[in-house]
């Protein structure tokens, strides 16, 4: 039994006494307690050690007071489970090898047994669930097919996604074959996370804004919808959040996937998003992460604007306060604590 279920109730657009808050990348480098653990181990080992992943997952709940925990992991564990070599190199970035650029490469990728290849994530979820003891809900997550596709084809991060788009435009059938294969794994991965104890799941499409509206509808949304529908079919009471970064012009299309909530980037007025969506889904967001570099007064002022612009809640509205992207690693934890405390206090007047 959850002692604090505000996050889940907000995702289901049920009445809540205040706006719940958590932030993307809340378990991370801005926390000295996290850095102390990272000094002793590398990033992927941390992801793959359930005891350590559990500890860092719970840190922001204990230290900051957020209303939900999100399991500590990385979106690229899916690529690794499918047979790619994933390296996260300090100060150099991410490298995946070999890059997937031909039919032979696609055929070489496996559809893994999730429990075998990603069992450490399930162990971390179960362990975290036990340690949380119902204090707050636990979120599972995956990258979206398009974002994982770009990493696979580019062999890492990219500025212009040239190899990924070359496959899209020259070999669209091949691109869809790879996207479909990745999507199958994502869907099974999300289902297994729920089975292991996740109370909600989020799909991160971090590179969504690299695509035009038409291309996003063709190469990204169908696979998000596939995963959302699979989750809602098997676990109808488990909320699904879709975060398609900076896709502000196709909000209705994203809502049409059947998701319960939608992450909103900071470059759109939340009042406009709510007006367009007409409370069909919960809106999650949407403060600029760099606001947390500001003074406490500035942080409160900017958070207050978002609460005010979302406005008074109706019987079927939902808002989860979050950043428009992940918290930056050099933010002062006290600034995030200021934000969380302010939202908890100030949001009551809108409910």
Curated annotation (Swiss-Prot):
Pathway in which this enzyme or protein is active: Porphyrin-containing compound metabolism; protoporphyrin-IX biosynthesis; coproporphyrinogen-III from 5-aminolevulinate: step 4/4
Catalytic activity field: uroporphyrinogen III + 4 H(+) = coproporphyrinogen III + 4 CO2
A GO term, aspect molecular function: uroporphyrinogen decarboxylase activity
Query: PROSITE patterns of this UniProt entry?
Result: UROD_1, UROD_2
Location(s) in or outside the cell: Cytoplasm
Q: Which Pfam families match?
A: URO-D
Q: Which GO terms describe its cellular component?
A: cytosol
Which controlled-vocabulary keywords does the entry list? Cytoplasm, Decarboxylase, Lyase, Porphyrin biosynthesis
Q: Which InterPro entries match?
A: UROD/MetE-like_sf, Uroporphyrinogen_deCO2ase_HemE, Uroporphyrinogen_deCOase
Decide whether keyword Cell wall biogenesis/degradation is in the record.
Answer: no
EC number(s) given by UniProt: 4.1.1.37
Cysteine pairings via disulfide bonds = none
- The reply to whether Lyase figures as a keyword in the UniProt entry is yes
Q: Can you tell me which residues bind substrate? A: 25-29, 74, 151, 206, 325
Write down the top EC class of this protein.
lyase
Which residues does the annotation list for site: Transition state stabilizer?
Answer: 74
Q: Known CDD domains for this protein?
A: URO-D
**What does the annotation say about its assembly with partners?**
Homodimer.
The Swiss-Prot or TrEMBL record describes its family as follows:
Belongs to the uroporphyrinogen decarboxylase family.
What protein does this entry describe? Uroporphyrinogen decarboxylase
Q: Which organism is it from?
A: Chlorobium phaeobacteroides (strain BS1)
Recorded name of the encoding gene:
hemE
